[in-house]
């Protein structure tokens, strides 16, 4: 257990260092204070010590900012729309229950209504590999954060390509599950009939 926790502490440090060194502020709308994540490592350690099965302990994630994370504002890239949720969206809660740790909220095309990654007052998210090119959207920040190695995985959404397009343009894996398999409660809707919560990772092996 101690090795796992030390690895998680190192992973948290590495994520924040990667974000700082990349100098790509447009990827993120909000980051948790590093001290909060370090405190959560101790909580994960206590759960492991109590015998909890935490298959995702050691993985660092990000959340597209149209999905609720308790204590972090949800903006959908529209500052005047911002609200502070008191509870995690079920998709986030399930991952936390499995030991995952989230460091912040990522940028997106406003209200998840774009496929280019440029329609945000928080900045146009540039492609991970060629900053002169678009990242794709609307889950632009989540895809680029994963491609740059700032996090192990990230949540996004897909209504009409918002997960698949940035995954393809940034050379990572993007999975759109069967609609209804993952709850969209706590997600700012673009289309209630079509919205899906998606996940990004650099390889399939992560899952």
Protein language model regions, located:
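Gly/Ser-rich catalytic/binding loops embedded in alpha/beta enzyme cores
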Residues: 1-159
């Amino acid at each position: 257990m101690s090795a796992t926790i030390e690895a998680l502490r190192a992973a948290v440090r590495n994520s924040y260092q990667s974000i700082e060194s990349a100098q790509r502020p447009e990827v993120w709308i909000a980051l948790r204070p590093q001290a909060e994540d370090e405190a959560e490592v101790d909580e994960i350690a206590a759960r492991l010590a109590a015998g909890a099965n935490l298959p995702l302990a050691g993985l660092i994630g990000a959340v597209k900012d149209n999905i609720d994370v308790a204590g972090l504002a949800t903006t959908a890239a529209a500052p005047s729309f911002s609200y502070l949720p008191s509870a995690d969206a079920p998709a986030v809660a399930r991952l936390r229950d499995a030991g995952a740790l989230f460091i912040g909220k990522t940028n997106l095309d406003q209200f998840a209504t774009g496929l280019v990654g440029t329609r945000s007052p928080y900045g146009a998210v540039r492609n991970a590999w060629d900053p002169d090119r678009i990242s794709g959207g609307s889950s632009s920040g989540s895809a680029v954060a994963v491609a740059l190695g700032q996090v192990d995985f990230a949540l996004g959404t897909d209504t009409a390509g918002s997960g698949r397009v940035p995954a393809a343009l940034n050379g990572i894996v993007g999975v759109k599950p069967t609609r209804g398999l993952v709850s969209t409660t706590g997600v700012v809707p673009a289309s209630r009939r079509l919205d899906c919560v998606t996940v990004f990772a650099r390889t399939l092996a992560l899952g």
